[in-house]
Structures are given as structure tokens and as C-alpha cells.
Design a protein with these regions (language model features):
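The feature marks the mature, well-folded catalytic cores of soluble enzymes
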Residues: 1-226
Length: 226
């Protein structure tokens, strides 16, 4: 989400593609495919290998570990013929798409407690089967705890809740809360498309109304400091 770094890489020949572009390719022998930190579903790797790409996998190690945990949980459910995987995350987020891919699309993504209630009411979530719960690595620990508590109150079948939020993200919440209260103005620098940046900036703003989200110095306004 660093626009300046992306621009630098583009100037050096980087071309950004999505899954549709990849599907349309016929041959990529000798080309290099860089997988971003959010990770990708297994089908992306399969297609890239088939096309002949050399793959440089830059998936975050924390995300890789989470992908493996979800894949193993899903495989166990498949062996037993029952069970469900719930992922607390943002629908459509790149990391979440990669996580869903570990379950052949079977995982249920829940964004908030309202959605949880809806999925329980309409039967999307089965309260009677073995359930494994994971979180996108950059979500709010407090929100995840609330969602898990809601499941614990209602689940009838076995329930396993996994602590999969990145420890760096989790500890930042406490430090940022203290930081936001100790300063008059918060200038929060992060890419505007970053889910992690938005979560952390919103945390600051909830404690200090004079919090401003920017991704370049050109956005800083003089009136903020009056």
C-alpha cells in the first residue's frame, strides 16, 4: 500500500496483474511472478507454475502460518465429513481470499457481530458442528474477542478459537491508545487502501478526534495545527 514504493517499482519495470490477467495468459516462460505480502490462494501458484513463471513468494510469514493452519483444519473436517471454518475478516480483502482458498472456497467469512447473527439466523453457520475460528492477521483484537464471545455463548458443537492476529498488530493497539491520548494531534501515515492502517488510524481517532490519515506530506494542512 506504499504508493511511493509502488511507483518506484513500476518505473523499474514492475507490472501489476490480478487473477483475471493470470487466467488469460498462455505462456510466461522466463518471467518472474512476485507474490505480495497478503498471500494468494493455491490456484494462483498452480496456474503460475503451469505458465512457467519463476515465483518469488513475498507472503508474510505470519500469513503463511495462518494459511497452513486453516488448510490443516479444513483437511481434518473433510476426513470426518463434517465441520466448518469461520474467518473473521474483511470480505474481498486479498489476505482473506488467500485464506478462503485453503478451504476450496468453503470457509465462512464474517465481518462483524451483525453478520454473525445473520449467518446464525439463516443457517449459514451451523451451531451443531465442529467449528474452527480464525482471524485475518490485521484485524482488531477487541472486535475478534467480541465475535468469539458471541459464538461461545451459542455454539452447541465443539468450538476451537485460534489466536491468529499478528502480535505486532495486537501490541500496537495498546501502544497507540496510550500515544493518542498523550498528544494533541496525530498524523497517521499509511496507505489509504491499507486495512491495517485504517484499523489503527480509527483506533487513534476514537481516542483523539484530531487524528489525520495521510500517505504523503502534500496532504498535511496548516489549519490542523491552529
Amino acid at each position: 500500500h506504499n504508493d511511493a514504493e509502488l511507483s518506484r517499482l513500476v518505473s523499474r519495470g514492475l507490472v501489476t496483474i490480478d487473477k483475471d490477467d493470470l487466467e488469460e495468459m498462455i505462456d510466461a516462460e522466463g518471467e518472474v511472478l512476485l507474490i505480495r505480502a497478503h498471500g494468494e490462494p493455491p490456484r494462483t501458484y498452480d496456474k503460475a507454475h503451469t505458465l512457467g513463471f519463476e515465483i518469488i513468494d513475498c507472503t508474510c510469514p505470519v500469513v503463511l502460518k495462518l494459511q497452513e493452519s486453516i488448510r490443516k483444519a479444513y483437511e481434518k473436517h473433510e476426513e470426518k465429513g463434517q465441520g466448518q471454518i469461520i474467518i473473521f475478516g474483511k470480505i474481498g480483502h486479498a489476505e482473506v481470499l488467500g485464506l478462503i482458498g485453503q478451504t476450496d472456497g468453503a470457509a465462512i467469512v464474517v465481518e462483524n457481530t451483525l453478520m454473525l447473527d445473520e449467518f446464525i439466523a439463516d443457517g449459514t453457520i451451523d451451531l451443531g458442528v465442529h467449528t474452527e475460528v480464525f482471524s485475518q492477521t490485521t484485524k482488531s483484537p477487541a472486535e475478534y474477542a467480541i465475535l468469539c464471545a458471541g459464538l461461545e455463548e451459542r455454539m452447541e458443537g465443539p468450538l476451537n478459537i485460534h489466536d491468529t492476529i499478528c502480535s505486532q498488530v495486537a501490541t500496537r493497539h495498546d501502544r497507540l491508545s496510550k500515544f493518542a491520548l498523550e498528544h494533541d494531534i496525530i498524523i497517521f501515515v499509511a496507505g489509504k487502501a491499507s486495512s491495517n492502517g485504517k484499523v489503527l488510524c480509527d483506533l487513534c481517532k476514537s481516542l483523539n478526534i484530531r487524528t489525520y490519515h495521510i500517505d504523503s506530506t502534500s496532504e498535511v494542512k496548516r489549519e490542523w495545527f491552529r
